[in-house]
Curated annotation (Swiss-Prot):
Gene Ontology molecular function, alphabetical: SNAP receptor activity; SNARE binding
Gene name of the encoded protein: VAMP7
Protein name: Vesicle-associated membrane protein 7
Family matches, as SUPFAM superfamilies: SNARE fusion complex, SNARE-like
Stretches in topological domain Vesicular: 210-220
Native source species: Pongo abelii (Sumatran orangutan)
GO cellular component: endoplasmic reticulum membrane; Golgi apparatus; late endosome membrane; lysosomal membrane; neuron projection; phagocytic vesicle; phagocytic vesicle membrane; SNARE complex
SMART domains for this protein: Longin
Quaternary state and interactors: Component of the SNARE complex composed of STX4, SNAP23 and VAMP7 that binds SYT7 during lysosomal exocytosis. Component of the SNARE complex composed of STX7, STX8, VAMP7 and VTI1B that is required for heterotypic fusion of late endosomes with lysosomes in liver cells. May interact with STX17. Interacts with PICALM. Interacts with RAB21.
InterPro entries: Longin-like_dom_sf, Longin_dom, Synaptobrevin-like, Synaptobrevin-like_transport, V_SNARE_CC
Domain named v-SNARE coiled-coil homology: residues: 125-185
Residue stretches spanning the membrane: 189-209
């Protein structure tokens, strides 16, 4: 349960972004930004197992993507904090800035606030409840269809690091077990070859030494 991605944009022009994990965030976000009207507004778009929350103020869009079980109030608290910090830092410069002009500086702010609002659960319960009521007043939830340029339905694909780590550990463990099994198999085969060779040599040499006890070859 976390905030997965955050972006600040002017219309469809991305000014700063940060992703918590891998995924096709930009491809999906570009479709979302193109559908957001320029007037001041707050809205949530559900899409599959994820929610897209945004605040639009003075043509600047503050947007984040969360799991569908992440509290909307926490998402909008995050967006409000990002909006306040961005406006304080850049002011009217955002209205004419080039794409990614603020990314080198503000992406670290997005990362820090994303982590803080995803993990912080120590708020006073009364204040938290009141903040939820106040924050969600007038914020609608509206369905949205995302269509890629090729005309196919666009889906958000998330590549969370934990899954990759688990797969890597499983692969390494399987490889190690396979190598151990092959080593034991080779060892058994080597022992069998040695035993067969000894028996074969014994059978060949025995007639030359006068029998199976080798009486003519063993000195008494």
């Amino acid at each position: 349960m976390a905030i997965l991605f955050a972006v600040v944009a002017r219309g469809t022009t991305i000014l700063a972004k940060h992703a918590w994990c891998g995924g096709n965030f930009l491809e999906v976000t570009e479709q979302i930004l193109a559908k957001i009207p320029s007037e001041n507004n707050k809205l949530t778009y559900p899409h599959g197992n994820y929610l897209f929350h945004y605040i639009c103020q003075d043509r600047i869009v503050y947007l984040c993507i969360t799991d569908d079980d992440f509290e909307r109030s926490r998402a909008f608290n995050f967006l409000n904090e990002i909006k306040k910090r961005f406006q304080t830092t850049y002011g009217s410069r955002a209205q004419t800035a080039l794409p990614y002009a603020m990314n080198s500086e503000f992406s670290s702010v997005l990362a820090a606030q994303l982590k803080h609002h995803s993990e912080n659960k120590g708020l006073d319960k009364v204040m938290e409840t009141q903040a939820q009521v106040d924050e969600l007043k007038g914020i609608m939830v509206r369905n949205i269809d995302l269509v890629a340029q090729r005309g196919e339905r666009l889906e958000l694909l998330i590549d969370k690091t934990e899954n990759l780590v688990d797969s890597s550990v499983t692969f390494k463990t399987t490889s190690r077990n396979l190598a151990r099994a092959m080593c034991m198999k080779n060892l058994k085969l080597t022992i069998i070859i040695i035993i067969v060779s000894i028996v074969f040599i014994y059978i060949i040499v025995s007639p030359l030494c006068g029998g199976f006890t080798w009486p003519s070859c063993v000195k008494k």
